[in-house]
Amino acid sequence: LISFARSLVKTDGVSYDAVMSMAINLDNQFNLPADYGSLDSRWNRNQVGPFIKLLKKFVKDSRFDAFYHSNENLYQEAVSRFMPIYKSIDTQWYNDFYGQKSNDRFHIILSMSNGPGNYGPSVTDKENVHNVFSVMGAWVTDSVGMVVYPPELILPILIHEFNHSFINFDPEMFRTSGEQIYAAVGEQMARQAYGQWSIV
């Protein structure tokens, strides 16, 4: 799986938010829905099946389920520390600000394995509900190494990540200008996890 995933980075640019796109589309058995049109376009459709097969094998071989459950106290502590921020988020603001009446469902994923990476993917489910996500990394810790979520740092990032679901669009209409701009600033943007023109 690891070698295959690395090859997808090199051949198709499957990295950053493309990985999160796969994660939110998978069900609890690591299956994709029959129609996975919301999967990031960097996922080559010919590679999705082999990736899922290898992922399931990895989950089984690594005894991931046992690992996950052995760390439940850690996850619960992270959730407890995040709750003040969770309680301060006003999801109605997005509808008011963007002028949309919608049945969006908001989800926060605390991903302590992401380090400082944060993402804002979305998926529309079979009931036509738009599920918007803020996948929050963990990079600030206390004196014993436990994650902390300083509101003044984390809340603006959380809001930013949810915004992606309301403003992302098909970038192809801006390909020419996007490629020109990225040629000039690509090196600096890549250091900020924007590895190609279409995600800037």
Where do the model's predicted regions map?
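Non-catalytic architectural context of zinc metalloproteases
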Residues: 1-84
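Post-HExxH zinc-binding segment in Zn-dependent metallohydrolases
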Residues: 1-21, 27, 169-200
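Second-shell loop/turn segments in exported
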Residues: 76-84, 143-148, 193-197
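Beta-strand/loop-rich accessory regions of lumenal/periplasmic or secreted enzymes
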Residues: 112-115, 147, 163
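Active-site recognition of the HExxH zinc-binding catalytic motif
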Residues: 152-176
